[in-house]
Swiss-Prot record:
This is Chalcone synthase WHP1. GO terms for biological process: flavonoid biosynthetic process; polyketide biosynthetic process. PROSITE patterns: CHALCONE_SYNTH (PS00441). PANTHER family: CHALCONE SYNTHASE, HYDROXYMETHYLGLUTARYL-COA SYNTHASE. It is an enzyme of class 2 (transferase). Belongs to the thiolase-like superfamily. Chalcone/stilbene synthases family. InterPro entries: Chalcone/stilbene_synt_C (IPR012328), Chalcone/stilbene_synt_N (IPR001099), Chalcone/stilbene_synthase_AS (IPR018088), Polyketide_synthase_type-III (IPR011141), Thiolase-like (IPR016039).
């Protein structure tokens, strides 16, 4: 038998991309049903038949007033909830009804976002080689990744399904996409985060007031991104480069955020001072990510931070001395969509890359070169992604 003509090292080098992973397109989608935060307390207590809990309703109104949210989108309509009263109780068996919603609607909303990203990318969907799908909404087999693959008509694609990750996972899908793109020459990775609050919606409880926080903050939405290394400058225009990515669990944070899937749905609880834990550790995360780059001025980078709530953003700003402008895109998404869990950071990236062109800035990162993306969620887990913007261009794509 003849000996091999190439070595393993040569094969490995041939499998790897030359340049860093890039974000090539972003698409977003929401349900049609829009709810305004100013009206939501009255609606929420009426639909859950809880108007008699007057003190709790006043507390919920104050939560909504302080949320910095103007509106949210929700698949669950008043008509649907009226027909499914078990979902309006605090602790009533309702998992079947919730599952019936999410196993259909999560991939459907993800498909709408994916189609927008494919349209912007402008390349045949047959070029998609990998799919990473993430949702905190329900579990099914075959999963939402399979359903989306079939719905889009993708033939040969390597799939990864991530269930029950929570709000940090928008950073996770980018970290995974980066690893896939840079280690598989020519790979084009589609990431999709699709979140529906049907698994978490429930009525109020006087004995579990912390559960009202999620009811005041969470909304539905899906975001999709197209990623790949070594973009073809003739037909692809990068939006951001993914420079590095890391995940960490914050010290002394066990139980800070947890969620448990039960017959009553997915019950979330906030058990500690989440804003304080994040702000206490944020500078260390920044130093670990940017010290190799010689960057220590946190106002010199653009920010994409998961908007877990206004208190988190306020305390992070105060801790590192951020100018208000740095969180503009993050606060805009919180205001217009609420907390959409894993999908949020992709919505923020989408908002950020659109605004510089409108404002006459020179890069996709608000005129700045380097940036950071943070995902915060159960664990308490933090995803940190270092980004590099690209120059704003017009006309046809050019070589990166």
């Amino acid at each position: 038998m003849a000996g091999a003509t190439v070595t393993v090292d040569e094969v490995r080098k041939g499998q790897r991309a030359t340049g860093p992973a890039t974000v090539l397109a972003i698409g977003t989608a929401t349900p049609a049903n829009c709810v305004y935060q100013a009206d939501y307390p009255d609606y929420y207590f009426r639909i859950t038949k809880s108007d008699h809990l007057t003190d709790l309703k006043e507390k919920f109104k104050r939560m909504c007033d302080k949320s910095m949210i103007r509106k949210r989108y929700m698949h669950l309509t008043e008509e649907f909830l009226s027909e499914n009263p078990s979902m309006c109780a605090y602790m009533a068996p309702s998992l079947d009804a919730r599952q019936d919603v999410v196993v259909t609607e999560v991939p459907k909303l993800g498909k709408a976002a994916a189609q927008e990203a494919i349209k912007e990318w402008g390349q045949p969907k047959s070029r998609i080689t990998h799919l990473v799908f993430c949702t905190t909404s329900g579990v099914d087999m075959p999963g939402a990744d399979y359903q989306l693959t079939k719905a889009l008509g993708l033939r040969v694609v390597n799939r990864l399904m991530m269930y029950q990750q929570g709000c940090f996972a928008g950073g996770t899908v980018l970290r995974v996409a980066k690893d896939v793109a840079e280690n598989n020459r020519g790979a084009r990775v589609m990431v999709v985060c699709s979140e529906i609050t049907a698994v978490t919606f429930r009525g109020p409880s006087e004995s579990h007031v912390d559960s009202l926080v999620g009811q005041a903050l969470f909304g539905d939405g899906a975001a999709a991104g197209r990623g790949g290394a070594d973009p073809d400058g003739r037909v692809e225009r990068p939006l951001f480069q993914l420079v590095s990515a890391a995940q960490t669990i914050l010290p002394d944070s066990e139980g800070a955020i947890d969620g448990h899937l039960r017959e009553v749905g997915l019950a979330f609880h906030l058990l500690k001072d989440v804003p304080g834990l994040i702000s206490k550790n944020i500078e260390r995360a920044l130093e670990d990510a940017f010290e190799p780059l010689g960057i220590s001025d946190w106002n010199s980078i653009f920010w994409v931070a998961h908007p877990g709530g206004p208190a988190i953003l306020d305390q992070v700003e105060a801790k590192v001395g951020l100018d208000k402008a740095r969180m503009r895109a993050t606060r805009h998404v919180l205001s217009e969509y609420g907390n959409m869990s894993s999908a949020c950071v992709l919505f923020i990236l989408d908002e950020m890359r659109k605004r510089p062109a409108e404002d006459g800035q020179s890069t996709t990162g608000e005129g700045l070169d380097w940036g950071v993306l943070f995902g915060f969620g159960p664990g308490l887990t933090v995803e940190t992604v270092v980004l590099h913007s690209v120059p704003i261009t017009t006309g046809a794509p050019t070589a990166a």
